[in-house]
Amino acid sequence: MATIRPFMGIRPAPEYAKDVAALPYDVMNTEEAREMVKGNPYSFLHINRAEIDLPVGTDPYSPAVYEKARDTFYEQLDKGIFTQDLLPNLYIYRLSMDGRSQTGLVVCTAIDEYLNDTIKKHELTRADKEADRIRHVDTLNANTGPIFLAYKENADAEAIIDGYTAAVPPVYDFVSEDGIGHTVWVIDSDTEIGMLVQSFANVENFYIADGHHRNASAVKVGLKRREQKP
């Protein structure tokens, strides 16, 4: 059985959300990332591609880059650019473009379900890319890149999501510079959280649609944490 869990998310304050939103870290090179953040000190690329705030020519895999990412992340948290929810929540995230949309849940999944193949993989991973994300996640003590998981049709979950999005206003609703609409709801009701968690009781597997390196890296950091705090 595939399981989901709520968590205390760290997320942008609503007034900063549009500025924080950024493309994935691995779809551009360093110079392109530098260009993208001009005039925007809040872009998440300052955290996910922190070499852009260090001297030109800095090795993007040097310890200084991960330390800079950590410092920027916690500085923005201290300044209120990001806030952390005080209780564990689930989140609904909708992406829209050209009249079409896809809606998903933002949740925690289990390391053990990755290890026992409840979470299915279909790609091999590269050691160098894993090492980069391991250092990033470990240094920041945060998972900064979501993994895109798919699952077979779940009518119960779909009904709960549809009902919630129809009844509750979103916390974010904006269009980013690339023309994609981002709409997010926070599910902070214990009733709906419990119903959604239970709705996955008959879901046998998750399938990694995107994020094999991020998932493998997060698992390895998680295993390291278990060793440190058995």
Where are these regions (language model features)?
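A cross-family signal for N-terminal binding/gating loops and helix N-caps
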Residues: 1-230
